[in-house]
Swiss-Prot record:
NCBIfam families: PRK05380.1, PyrG. The lineage of its organism: Bacteria, Pseudomonadati, Pseudomonadota, Gammaproteobacteria, Pseudomonadales. It comes from Azotobacter vinelandii (strain DJ / ATCC BAA-1303). InterPro entries: Class_I_gatase-like, CTP_synthase, CTP_synthase_N, GATASE, GATase1_CTP_Synthase, P-loop_NTPase. PANTHER family: CTP SYNTHASE, CTP SYNTHASE-RELATED. This is CTP synthase. Its EC number is 6.3.4.2.
Length: 543
């Protein structure tokens, strides 16, 4: 019988509801409970797949091919549960399904309203997403008081009532600001945020109070008094030097005990030794490398959230401080590759569209010609193929049809036919919808023996997640191979290029998939660990 923990936020956005939820879930998992997490997004987009990275940040791809909120990446990094398309839904998705049923006649001519039809659909999706977990954390996006969040808050109010107090509780994150001129923290914003919640029938059971300064006992007592929350359930969460400390911070204040007692769960004590090891390795590195990351969304680094975290995980696994030097690919176009000098390795991540592509291609050429370790991901592989065709084969007009549909040598092109998650053949074209029409989710990849990528993974077959609609053109591939390009990874059926390497180079690997989506702080990821080791070797060669 699943218990539900609803998580809301107040005062301001971006308080870290996702990380707080994932951290509590990690503690409960460490106590032997089966946990899952859901993210409910109030925006009207059906999913974040076509949203600008500058507005939304990263689109996290699940194993089953859903394009979801980046918080699901936090969830998978903190718990062992694999998220699916059922772990994230939006207002747009809810309305789309309700309207489809209305058109089909499922409501028998009823007037479709927010209550009960929209709220019932939200509740149905929460219950479905929770599955058979012991505890389901349900994070409501946005801030209490936002008009967009109201149907979700009403739905969880109803669900709390329906399942009963022994199976549902509410955690509310708020901000306790520090006023420097007064020299004290202020509790009034938290009081008003809880007042807003209570006005719609929701009484928090726990408050997690975010602050950049310590919150003293008297302030916590004051918050408890004015919000009708137990004093021990007012949890102080100050800024920390690594997010992987947060499970220990919450555990030290007894948050998991409050949950277990409330739900009457029989479970063991929490063993957080894995997290202590992660934090120790993160904060006490023995080595250091600098890696140039050449991207096109550098104004909002959340666009590369999983990738940045994955590089940190590789540092943890190698006891190495990984300093990422963020370089906008357009700056390389304007200022040249001198921006890359001094880097121990070069990383080119994915992206869409023509802007900044020539800067990425220049970064690839610099890495290849100067024997600097290189890792390309998704577009980072495609630009590596383009660079090789131009500068090794001499095809000056080589390009991707994404950027130049009439180029003379389209070494990367739109794949027009493949199988969807059900095994059915799906045909697509340039005129297909942009949303939900990519090669998405986990796919098998066969690795070549004696390759750098095979050495990293230590096995012949891997499963990695994809998010792209362009592939290496098989018609021109033989020319690339003849010129020395090595194809060291192919799709399970052998039809598509998944990994390339360059001969006579210390470490040059580019992959079509996104390995960052499966990297975790406790386990790391073999490809990123191999990349950091290559950067360490490069640094030693330069010394």
């Amino acid at each position: 019988m699943t218990r539900y923990i609803f998580v809301t936020g107040g005062v301001v956005s971006s308080l870290g509801k996702g990380i707080a939820s994932a951290s509590l879930a990690a503690i409960l998992e460490a106590r032997g409970l089966k946990v899952t997490l859901l993210k409910l997004d109030p925006y009207i987009n059906v999913d974040p797949g076509t949203m600008s990275p500058f507005q939304h940040g990263e689109v996290f791809v699940t194993h089953d091919g859903a394009e979801t909120d980046l918080d699901l990446g936090h969830y998978e990094r903190f718990v062992r549960t694999t998220m699916t398309r059922n772990n994230n839904f939006t207002t747009g998705r809810v309305y789309e399904d309700v309207l489809r049923r209305e058109r089909r006649g499922d409501y028998l001519g009823a007037t479709i309203q927010v209550i009960p039809h929209i709220t019932d659909e939200i509740k149905r999706r929460i219950i479905k997403g929770a599955g058979n977990a012991d505890v389901a954390m349900v994070e409501i996006g946005g801030t209490v008081g936002d008009i967009e969040s109201q149907p979700f808050l009403e739905a969880i109010r109803q669900l709390r009532l329906e399942v009963g107090a022994k199976r549902a509780m509410l955690i509310h994150l708020t901000l306790v600001p520090y006023i420097a001129t007064a020299g004290e923290t202020k509790t009034k914003p938290t009081q008003h945020s809880v007042k807003e919640l209570r006005s719609i029938g929701l009484q928090p059971d726990v408050l997690i109070c975010r602050s950049d300064h310590p919150i003293d006992i008297s302030s916590r007592r004051k918050i408890a008094l004015f919000t009708n929350v137990e004093e021990r359930a007012v949890i102080a969460l100050e800024d920390v030097d690594t997010i992987y400390k947060i499970p220990s911070v919450l555990h030290a204040q007894g948050l998991d005990d409050i949950v277990v007692e409330r739900f009457g769960l029989a479970c063991g004590s929490a063993d957080l030794s894995e997290w202590e090891r992660v934090v120790d390795a993160k904060l006490h590195p023995e080595k250091e490398v600098t890696i140039a990351m050449v991207g096109k969304y550098m104004e909002l680094l959340d666009a590369y959230k999983s990738l940045i975290e994955a590089m940190g995980h590789a540092g943890i696994q190698n006891r190495t401080r990984v300093n990422l030097r963020y370089i906008d690919s357009e700056d390389i176009e304007n200022q040249g590759t001198a921006l890359l000098e001094g880097a121990d390795a070069i990383l080119v991540p994915g992206g869409f569209g023509l802007r900044g592509v020539e800067g990425k291609i220049a970064a690839v050429r610099y890495a290849r010609e100067n024997k600097v370790p290189y890792l390309g991901i998704c577009l980072g592989m495609q630009v590596a193929v383009i660079e090789y065709a131009r500068d090794v084969l001499g095809w000056a007009d080589a390009n991707s049809t994404e950027f130049d549909k009439s180029c003379g040598h389209p070494v990367v092109g739109l794949i027009t036919e493949w199988q969807d998650a059900t095994g059915a053949t799906e045909v697509r074209s340039e005129s297909s919808d942009l949303g939900g029409t990519m090669r998405l989710g986990a796919q098998e990849c066969q690795l070549e023996a004696n390759s750098q990528v095979r050495q990293c993974y230590g096995k012949d077959e891997v499963v990695e997640r994809h998010r792209h609609r362009y592939e290496v053109n098989n018609n021109l591939l033989p020319h690339l191979i003849e010129a020395g390009l090595k194809v060291t990874g192919r799709s399970g059926d052998g039809a598509l290029v998944e990994v390339i390497e360059v001969a006579d180079h210390p470490w040059f690997v580019a992959c079509q998939f996104h390995p960052e989506f499966t990297s975790t702080p406790r386990d790391g990821h073999p490809l990123f660990s191999g990349f950091v080791n290559a950067a360490l070797a490069q640094k030693a060669r330069k010394a």
